[in-house]
Protein backbone atom coordinates (compact mmCIF):
# COMPACT_ATOMS: atom_id res chain seq x y z
CA UNK A 1 0.00 0.00 0.00
CA UNK A 2 1.08 3.55 -0.71
CA UNK A 3 1.02 6.64 1.48
CA UNK A 4 -2.09 7.76 -0.39
CA UNK A 5 -3.85 4.47 0.46
CA UNK A 6 -3.30 5.04 4.18
CA UNK A 7 -4.48 8.65 3.96
CA UNK A 8 -7.60 7.64 2.01
CA UNK A 9 -8.33 5.19 4.82
CA UNK A 10 -7.56 1.61 5.77
CA UNK A 11 -8.90 -0.79 8.41
CA UNK A 12 -5.89 -2.87 9.43
CA UNK A 13 -6.23 -6.18 11.26
CA UNK A 14 -3.42 -6.44 13.80
CA UNK A 15 -2.63 -9.37 16.09
CA UNK A 16 -1.51 -7.53 19.23
CA UNK A 17 1.29 -9.33 21.06
CA UNK A 18 1.04 -10.24 24.73
CA UNK A 19 2.41 -7.55 27.10
CA UNK A 20 2.07 -4.73 24.55
CA UNK A 21 -0.45 -1.98 25.29
CA UNK A 22 -2.87 -1.10 22.50
CA UNK A 23 -1.33 2.39 22.51
CA UNK A 24 2.16 0.94 21.95
CA UNK A 25 0.94 -1.04 18.94
CA UNK A 26 -0.75 1.98 17.35
CA UNK A 27 2.18 4.25 18.16
CA UNK A 28 4.64 1.84 16.51
CA UNK A 29 2.50 1.81 13.37
CA UNK A 30 2.07 5.58 13.36
CA UNK A 31 5.83 6.08 13.66
CA UNK A 32 6.42 3.69 10.75
CA UNK A 33 3.86 5.41 8.52
CA UNK A 34 5.31 8.85 9.24
CA UNK A 35 9.00 8.00 9.09
CA UNK A 36 9.08 5.36 6.36
CA UNK A 37 6.42 6.76 4.05
CA UNK A 38 7.30 10.39 4.68
CA UNK A 39 3.87 11.29 6.01
CA UNK A 40 4.09 14.41 8.17
CA UNK A 41 0.58 13.95 9.50
CA UNK A 42 -1.80 11.00 9.54
CA UNK A 43 -4.82 10.11 11.63
CA UNK A 44 -4.62 6.67 13.22
CA UNK A 45 -6.50 4.96 16.05
CA UNK A 46 -7.83 1.62 17.24
CA UNK A 47 -11.40 0.38 17.67
CA UNK A 48 -11.28 -1.13 21.15
CA UNK A 49 -8.53 -1.46 23.75
CA UNK A 50 -6.95 -4.80 24.63
CA UNK A 51 -5.29 -5.15 28.04
CA UNK A 52 -1.51 -5.75 28.03
CA UNK A 53 -2.15 -9.25 29.40
CA UNK A 54 -4.41 -10.06 26.43
CA UNK A 55 -3.38 -10.82 22.86
CA UNK A 56 -5.32 -10.87 19.64
CA UNK A 57 -7.35 -8.76 17.27
CA UNK A 58 -6.88 -5.01 17.25
CA UNK A 59 -8.61 -3.03 14.48
CA UNK A 60 -6.41 -0.08 13.56
CA UNK A 61 -7.96 2.61 11.36
CA UNK A 62 -5.99 5.15 9.33
CA UNK A 63 -6.90 8.35 7.51
CA UNK A 64 -10.57 8.76 6.70
CA UNK A 65 -11.31 5.27 8.06
CA UNK A 66 -10.91 6.70 11.59
CA UNK A 67 -14.47 7.99 11.15
CA UNK A 68 -15.61 4.35 11.40
CA UNK A 69 -14.01 3.74 14.81
CA UNK A 70 -17.18 4.39 16.85
CA UNK A 71 -19.18 2.01 14.66
CA UNK A 72 -16.51 -0.70 14.87
CA UNK A 73 -16.28 -0.33 18.66
CA UNK A 74 -19.98 -1.11 18.92
CA UNK A 75 -19.70 -4.51 17.24
CA UNK A 76 -19.77 -7.81 19.12
CA UNK A 77 -16.44 -9.19 20.33
CA UNK A 78 -15.32 -12.81 20.65
CA UNK A 79 -12.67 -14.07 23.05
CA UNK A 80 -11.01 -17.31 24.07
CA UNK A 81 -9.15 -17.78 27.32
CA UNK A 82 -8.63 -19.59 30.60
CA UNK A 83 -10.16 -19.30 34.07
CA UNK A 84 -8.18 -20.52 37.08
CA UNK A 85 -10.71 -21.97 39.52
CA UNK A 86 -10.06 -21.87 43.26
CA UNK A 87 -8.33 -18.51 43.73
CA UNK A 88 -8.98 -14.80 43.20
CA UNK A 89 -6.81 -11.73 42.60
CA UNK A 90 -7.69 -8.04 43.19
CA UNK A 91 -7.39 -7.31 39.45
CA UNK A 92 -9.32 -10.49 38.49
CA UNK A 93 -6.31 -11.53 36.35
CA UNK A 94 -2.54 -12.03 36.61
CA UNK A 95 -1.72 -8.34 37.01
CA UNK A 96 -1.90 -8.82 40.79
CA UNK A 97 -1.07 -11.69 43.15
CA UNK A 98 -3.58 -14.21 44.53
CA UNK A 99 -5.35 -12.71 47.56
CA UNK A 100 -7.66 -15.58 48.52
CA UNK A 101 -7.98 -19.32 47.92
CA UNK A 102 -11.19 -21.35 47.85
CA UNK A 103 -12.34 -24.95 48.01
CA UNK A 104 -12.91 -26.67 44.67
CA UNK A 105 -13.71 -30.23 45.82
CA UNK A 106 -17.42 -29.67 45.13
CA UNK A 107 -16.87 -28.44 41.56
CA UNK A 108 -17.87 -30.93 38.87
CA UNK A 109 -18.12 -30.68 35.10
CA UNK A 110 -21.90 -30.66 35.49
CA UNK A 111 -21.72 -27.64 37.84
CA UNK A 112 -19.43 -25.78 35.44
CA UNK A 113 -21.74 -26.30 32.46
CA UNK A 114 -24.80 -25.39 34.54
CA UNK A 115 -23.13 -22.19 35.78
CA UNK A 116 -22.53 -21.07 32.18
CA UNK A 117 -26.31 -20.78 31.72
CA UNK A 118 -26.46 -18.01 34.37
CA UNK A 119 -24.27 -15.78 32.21
CA UNK A 120 -26.12 -16.01 28.89
CA UNK A 121 -28.17 -13.06 27.67
CA UNK A 122 -28.29 -9.62 29.28
CA UNK A 123 -26.49 -9.52 32.63
CA UNK A 124 -25.55 -6.94 35.26
CA UNK A 125 -21.78 -6.69 35.51
CA UNK A 126 -19.54 -4.76 37.89
CA UNK A 127 -16.29 -3.65 36.18
CA UNK A 128 -12.98 -4.53 37.87
CA UNK A 129 -11.43 -1.99 40.25
CA UNK A 130 -8.31 -2.33 38.09
CA UNK A 131 -9.87 -0.69 35.01
CA UNK A 132 -9.69 2.65 33.19
CA UNK A 133 -13.26 3.71 34.01
CA UNK A 134 -13.37 7.14 35.65
CA UNK A 135 -14.84 7.69 39.12
CA UNK A 136 -14.59 10.99 41.03
CA UNK A 137 -12.14 12.38 38.48
CA UNK A 138 -9.70 9.46 38.64
CA UNK A 139 -9.34 6.13 36.85
CA UNK A 140 -10.50 3.17 38.94
CA UNK A 141 -7.03 1.63 38.80
CA UNK A 142 -5.64 4.85 40.32
CA UNK A 143 -8.04 4.48 43.25
CA UNK A 144 -7.03 0.81 43.56
CA UNK A 145 -3.30 1.51 43.60
CA UNK A 146 -3.83 4.23 46.21
CA UNK A 147 -5.65 1.73 48.42
CA UNK A 148 -8.91 3.69 48.18
CA UNK A 149 -12.31 2.01 48.38
CA UNK A 150 -14.83 3.21 45.80
CA UNK A 151 -18.38 2.22 44.96
CA UNK A 152 -18.54 0.72 41.45
CA UNK A 153 -21.89 0.73 39.67
CA UNK A 154 -23.22 -2.29 37.80
CA UNK A 155 -23.48 -2.07 34.02
CA UNK A 156 -25.70 -3.89 31.56
CA UNK A 157 -23.89 -6.14 29.11
CA UNK A 158 -24.91 -9.02 26.86
CA UNK A 159 -23.32 -12.45 26.50
CA UNK A 160 -24.40 -13.91 23.15
CA UNK A 161 -22.42 -17.15 23.37
CA UNK A 162 -20.51 -18.83 26.22
CA UNK A 163 -18.86 -22.17 25.48
CA UNK A 164 -16.61 -24.27 27.71
CA UNK A 165 -13.91 -25.80 25.49
CA UNK A 166 -11.72 -27.62 28.03
CA UNK A 167 -11.96 -28.62 31.69
CA UNK A 168 -8.77 -29.64 33.45
CA UNK A 169 -9.20 -28.26 36.97
CA UNK A 170 -8.07 -25.87 38.21
CA UNK A 171 -8.12 -24.61 34.60
CA UNK A 172 -11.23 -24.09 32.49
CA UNK A 173 -10.95 -22.88 28.88
CA UNK A 174 -13.77 -20.90 27.29
CA UNK A 175 -15.03 -19.03 24.23
CA UNK A 176 -17.26 -16.00 24.77
CA UNK A 177 -19.07 -13.73 22.31
CA UNK A 178 -20.23 -10.53 23.99
CA UNK A 179 -21.35 -6.94 23.54
CA UNK A 180 -19.23 -3.80 23.74
CA UNK A 181 -17.98 -2.95 27.22
CA UNK A 182 -17.97 -6.48 28.61
CA UNK A 183 -15.12 -7.24 31.01
CA UNK A 184 -14.05 -10.87 30.66
CA UNK A 185 -12.06 -10.45 33.89
CA UNK A 186 -15.33 -9.71 35.70
CA UNK A 187 -16.92 -12.79 34.17
CA UNK A 188 -13.98 -14.83 35.48
CA UNK A 189 -14.47 -13.46 38.99
CA UNK A 190 -18.26 -13.81 38.94
CA UNK A 191 -18.05 -17.33 37.49
CA UNK A 192 -16.09 -18.51 40.53
CA UNK A 193 -18.53 -16.84 42.93
CA UNK A 194 -21.48 -18.47 41.18
CA UNK A 195 -19.95 -21.87 41.99
CA UNK A 196 -19.33 -20.95 45.67
CA UNK A 197 -15.62 -20.72 44.96
CA UNK A 198 -13.25 -18.21 43.39
CA UNK A 199 -11.75 -17.69 39.95
CA UNK A 200 -9.48 -15.37 38.00
CA UNK A 201 -8.41 -14.94 34.38
CA UNK A 202 -5.03 -16.38 33.40
CA UNK A 203 -5.18 -16.09 29.59
CA UNK A 204 -7.22 -14.01 27.14
CA UNK A 205 -7.19 -13.66 23.36
CA UNK A 206 -9.59 -11.61 21.24
CA UNK A 207 -10.45 -13.60 18.14
CA UNK A 208 -13.20 -11.55 16.47
CA UNK A 209 -14.71 -8.07 16.24
CA UNK A 210 -17.91 -8.25 14.22
CA UNK A 211 -16.98 -10.11 11.03
CA UNK A 212 -13.27 -9.34 11.39
CA UNK A 213 -11.23 -12.41 12.41
CA UNK A 214 -7.78 -12.59 13.99
CA UNK A 215 -7.02 -15.40 11.52
CA UNK A 216 -6.66 -12.65 8.91
CA UNK A 217 -4.56 -10.35 11.13
CA UNK A 218 -0.82 -9.70 11.01
CA UNK A 219 1.74 -8.95 13.70
CA UNK A 220 2.69 -5.30 14.30
CA UNK A 221 6.25 -5.90 13.08
CA UNK A 222 4.97 -7.73 9.99
CA UNK A 223 3.12 -4.51 9.17
CA UNK A 224 6.04 -2.19 9.90
CA UNK A 225 8.85 -4.03 8.06
CA UNK A 226 7.36 -4.01 4.49
CA UNK A 227 6.89 -0.23 4.69
CA UNK A 228 10.63 0.07 4.07
CA UNK A 229 9.92 -0.74 0.41
CA UNK A 230 6.53 0.97 0.07
CA UNK A 231 7.67 4.48 -0.91
Enumerate the language-model features and the residues they cover:
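Catalytic/RNA-binding core of pseudouridine synthases
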Residues: 1-231
Amino acid sequence: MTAEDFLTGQILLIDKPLHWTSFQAVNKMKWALKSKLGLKKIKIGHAGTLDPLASGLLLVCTGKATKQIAELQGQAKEYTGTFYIGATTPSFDLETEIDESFLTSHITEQLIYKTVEQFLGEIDQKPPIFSAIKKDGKRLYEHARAGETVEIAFRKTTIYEFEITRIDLPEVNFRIKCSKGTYIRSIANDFGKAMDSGSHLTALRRTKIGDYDVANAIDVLAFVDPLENAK
